[in-house]
Each structure stands twice: as structure tokens, then as C-alpha cells.
Curated annotation (Swiss-Prot):
Family from the record: Belongs to the class-I aminoacyl-tRNA synthetase family.
NCBIfam families: PRK12284.1 (NF008923), trpS (TIGR00233)
InterPro entries: aa-tRNA-synth_Ic, Rossmann-like_a/b/a_fold, Trp-tRNA-ligase, Trp-tRNA-ligase_bac-type, Trp-tRNA_synthetase, YegP-like_sf
Annotated Gene Ontology cellular component terms: cytosol
Lineage: Bacteria, Pseudomonadati, Pseudomonadota, Gammaproteobacteria, Lysobacterales
Designated gene of the protein: trpS
Name this polypeptide is given: Tryptophan--tRNA ligase
Top EC class for this record: ligase
Length: 435
């Protein structure tokens, strides 16, 4: 069993160095970590909320896909797919829409921000607001829940969307009486790197101070030399801390190189020479990526084929089976199977198995699966925290094969067939699977 981690990739705009350092590079380094199954999707349906230029939408999707591939995302090791290639996402969105509370959507940060802006201008609350913007959190929830993601890396400003996804999943599970949807967790990286822009403020498209990731070598040099610095002349000591030039250098150089660069500034290195060193350091890392990016951009058909193939395999493995189960749960069933029920024959009640989570005297947390007569079917090994144990329980609930019962975190299972039957009974009963 592995932890599923899902990352959405915005497909609007041109990637800049801030995107690369703060999001792309760390995400790719984390991809394919042991015990992790990584999902990356191009959020082209989301982009339609803001962008209604079809040529721009198409071009941007290609550029973003080429960017991530050029930076090292390996589609042989992770899942990379386009949102619009998985129609089950929008079908799940509708099922979630039918259980989502409007009051929760009213409190969505993005929607509230536009409402507040309209009010400050004396306009109607919903002036210029589309249903797409209002329903954005439900689409995001469908992205996450369709593939039973356990963790979603987000910034603190996105935590609300994960909480909404959890709420919608809980409502659905409660209404239809089963553990159909896994409740995701927000994975917050407190060390997300932010780069200064050309003017010293945070690099952001809204400030117009970005440096495109894959501009030409000559253009990159012009951008670097346009970074704002103080007026201290060559020979005068300069402070590295707070300098945009030094902060950018830190993002691309090792600790020893940064220490030498900082010392050179203190000893009077001129800003012109400092920018030359910065440019050479950035270009050393970006140049090979730029070549790969240009190669991918010359082969859009290959990218299209890869995205479609990945989406097709994911649909077959995960999306289609889950939607079939959800359709059955909500009653979207074949009418040929609809029969008038006969008078039910009373049956002897058989106690259901149960999952128990508990803490031992060693301070560690455990769980076990017990049958209706109290016999232990599965015993876990110890976990450091209740959260770790809970995440494994969430994975264990979905086990459908004997191979998945072989894990270093589980004691050897004596009879996998009995265990799988017990889990299946619990799922069919639609009960909470642990106490």
C-alpha cells in the first residue's frame, strides 16, 4: 500500500523562475518517493474560469506540459495527465454538487474576495462572477477524490479547499452509507521558497517583475542586469542579506558557493560583476532544461499522445471503477435489474468485523481487524502518531488483493481470503470501519 499524493498544475500564464524554484523543482524532486504514488494533472478545466481565449488555452497547456517534462518529471514513474481527458472528474463533480452545502461555497476565499471587491465599488455582490468561479471548490474536490488522494501539497491559502473536499466526501459517505470516498489531508510545506522579482518584491505576474523560465540566454542576461540594487559602488562593502541579487543566487547555488558570494559582496564586489556571476549560475542550471523544453515544444503530438495514454490507463484502473460504484450507490442503475422485492425472509444476524485503533504502553499506536467473534484477523505494527496510524487505516480499508496485505507495517496475515472477505463485508454494510 502506498500514499497517494496529488498535485494540480495551473495551465495559465508563462512559467517564471519563481514558479520553478518554489513549486516545479521541489515537486519533481519529491516525485516517486518510496511508498508514494504521485499524480500530477494539468488543470485545463480550471483555467477556463479566467481564460476564455481558446488559442491561449491550448498554447498554455502545451507550454506547461513541456515545462514540467523538461524539468525532469518522468511519466514512466508518476502519473501525468490532462484534467479534461478524464470525464469522470466532471461526473463526480456533479455528484458532489448535489451534496455540497451552498453556505460552504459562499465562504470560499476566491468567491468572497470578488464579492468584497464588488461591494467596495458599490456594485452588485455577484457582478462579473460566473458559476464556474463559485463552483471551483467542487471541481477541485472532484480532482482530489476521484483518485482517492491521501495528501495534497498546498500553500496555507489553499487549505480551505482541502477542508471543503473533506466535507463533501464526508457528506457523500454519510448520505449513501459507505466509505466510498477517501478523506484527503493537506500537506503544507512551511519551507516553500519565494524569489524576489526584478524590483525586489516577491516575484509575481501581478507585479510584472518576473523572469521567464525559458527565455533565451540573451534575454535572461538582460533580465538579470535589470534587477534593482542600491547605489553602492564597486569597492564599497555590500550587505548580502536583503539583496535581491544574493537571494536569487542562493536559490541556484550550494551553501559553500553562497558563503563565498556573500563574502565577496562584503569585500566590495561590484553589482555589475555580481550580476554576471548570478546570470552564469542561473543559466548553468536552466540552459539544459531550456534545450529540453524547446525539443518538447517541437513535438506537441508526442506530448498529446503521452497525456492521452496516461489518462486512459488511469481511467481504466481508478476512475471508471469508482464512478461505477458511486453510480450504484446513488441509484443510477440499470433498470433491467429493478425488481419488486418479495417479503424479506428474516435472517440470523451475524456480527460484523471491526477495526480498532488503540495505544499501547510503549507509547506507539496500533490497529487491528477483529472478526464478529472477537478473533484477531490482522494486527498492525506500531506507529509513532495517531495520524500515521489513521493514514494506514484509510489505506487498509481499500485493500482488495492479498498482495496488498504484505507490508512491513502489518504482522503476517494467516488467512488473506478471510481478511479480504471481512473488509468487503464492512464496505457492503456501509459502516464506519473503525472505532
Amino acid at each position: 500500500m502506498s500514499i497517494r499524493v496529488l498535485t494540480g498544475i495551473t495551465t495559465s500564464g508563462t512559467p517564471h523562475l519563481g514558479n520553478y524554484v518554489g513549486a516545479i523543482r521541489p515537486a519533481i524532486r519529491a516525485a516517486g518517493a518510496p511508498g508514494t504514488e504521485s499524480f500530477y494533472f494539468l488543470a485545463d478545466l480550471h483555467s477556463l474560469i479566467k481564460v476564455q481565449d481558446p488559442e491561449r488555452t491550448q498554447r498554455s497547456t502545451l507550454e506547461i506540459a513541456a515545462t514540467w517534462l523538461a524539468c525532469g518529471l518522468d511519466p514512466e514513474k508518476v502519473w501525468l495527465y490532462r484534467q479534461s481527458d478524464v470525464p469522470e472528474i466532471t461526473e463526480l463533480m456533479w455528484l458532489l454538487t448535489c451534496v455540497a452545502g451552498k453556505g460552504i461555497l459562499n465562504r470560499a476565499h476566491a468567491y468572497k474576495a470578488v464579492v468584497d471587491k464588488n461591494r467596495s465599488h458599490g456594485d452588485d455582490d455577484d457582478a462579473g462572477i460566473t458559476a464556474g468561479l463559485f463552483m471551483y471548490p467542487v471541481l477541485m474536490a472532484a480532482d482530489i477524490l476521484l483518485f482517492n488522494a491521501h495528501q495534497v501539497p498546498v500553500g496555507r491559502d489553499q487549505i480551505q479547499h482541502i477542508e471543503m473536499a473533506r466535507d463533501f466526501a464526508q457528506r457523500f459517505n454519510h448520505i449513501y452509507g459507505g466509505e466510498y470516498l477517501v478523506l484527503p489531508e493537506a500537506a503544507i510545506d512551511e519551507q516553500v521558497a519565494t524569489l524576489p522579482g526584478l524590483d525586489g518584491r516577491k516575484m509575481s505576474k501581478s507585479y510584472g517583475n518576473t523572469m521567464p523560465l525559458f527565455c533565451t540566454r540573451e534575454e535572461l542576461k538582460k533580465y538579470v542586469f535589470s534587477i534593482v540594487t542600491d547605489s553602492r559602488a564597486p569597492g564599497e562593502p555590500k550587505e548580502a542579506v536583503g539583496s535581491a541579487v544574493f537571494q536569487l543566487y542562493q536559490a541556484f547555488a550550494g551553501v559553500e558557493e553562497c558563503s563565498m558570494f556573500a563574502q565577496a559582496l562584503v569585500e566590495g564586489l561590484g553589482w555589475g560583476e555580481a550580476k554576471v556571476r548570478l546570470f552564469e549560475r542561473i543559466d548553468a542550471e536552466v540552459a539544459p532544461l531550456r534545450e529540453r523544453y524547446e525539443d518538447f515544444m517541437r513535438r506537441p503530438a508526442d506530448i498529446e499522445a503521452m497525456l492521452r495514454d496516461s489518462a486512459g490507463r488511469l481511467r481504466e484502473r481508478d476512475a471508471i471503477p469508482l464512478l461505477a460504484r458511486l453510480r450504484e450507490a446513488v441509484g443510477l442503475r440499470s433498470l433491467s435489474l429493478c425488481m419488486v422485492s418479495a417479503v424479506p425472509v428474516p435472517q440470523e444476524k451475524v456480527a460484523l468485523p471491526v477495526l480498532k485503533q488503540y495505544r499501547e504502553q510503549d507509547g506507539r499506536f496500533y490497529f487491528k481487524l477483529i472478526d464478529g467473534q472477537g478473533a484477531v484477523l490482522v494486527q498492525s505494527r506500531g506507529f509513532a502518531s495517531p495520524r500515521d496510524a489513521g493514514q494506514w487505516i484509510a489505506l487498509f480499508k481499500q485493500v482488495v488483493s492479498a498482495e496488498a496485505l504484505v507490508s512491513p507495517m502489518l504482522e503476517p496475515v494467516a488467512d488473506p481470503v478471510v481478511v479480504l472477505a471481512a473488509l468487503r463485508r464492512l464496505r457492503e454494510a456501509g459502516l464506519d470501519l473503525y472505532t
